[in-house]
Regions:
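Amphipathic, charge-rich alpha-helical segments that serve as recognition/docking helices
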Residues: 2-78, 84, 100-101
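Amphipathic alpha-helical extensions and coiled-coil-like segments
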Residues: 38-41, 66-141
């Protein structure tokens, strides 16, 4: 037998409770943390409580700064292949964040280059790719 506490709560409160519980796990993948933070932020926005609770408050329980919470949330915009590379620590978190600003076709281009060369961009290269994208000078081959 396992002791159980049953609580009556709405969907958004249940999401927040589930996310808080999952973030306490000792070994959590970057993608899991990313989606947990995003779900919690969305639940709080839906409840209209985001004004009182910030990204800083969300990250506090997991010892992450507000800036780090936003970085993790950015990872949720990566296509699966790139996100899996972050989870496997083949791509660093910050490189993943930079690549998350690219469109899906642009991210696919990065993955195609990886498949042909076996390499992902460095942080400096990822920043340059993002800069070209924002300046609309990135050309897809």
């Amino acid at each position: 037998e396992v002791p159980v506490i049953i609580r009556n709560m709405d969907q958004d409160t249940a999401v927040r409770a589930m996310v808080d519980s999952n973030l306490q796990r000792p070994n959590i993948l970057p993608s899991e943390k990313a989606f947990a933070y995003r779900m919690k932020m969305e639940a709080m926005n839906h409840q209209g409580t985001s004004g009182g609770i910030s990204a800083k408050d969300i990250g506090k329980n997991a010892n992450d700064s507000a800036r780090q919470v936003y970085r993790y949330i950015r990872l949720t915009y990566l296509m699966n292949d790139l996100l899996n590379a972050v989870d496997r620590d083949v791509i660093g978190l910050q490189v993943g964040v930079e690549l998350s600003y690219l469109t899906v076709p642009e991210q696919e281009m990065v993955e195609e280059v990886h498949e042909s060369t076996g390499k992902y961009p460095s942080l400096e290269q990822a920043k340059k790719i993002r800069q070209h994208r924002e300046e609309k000078t990135l050309i897809l081959l």
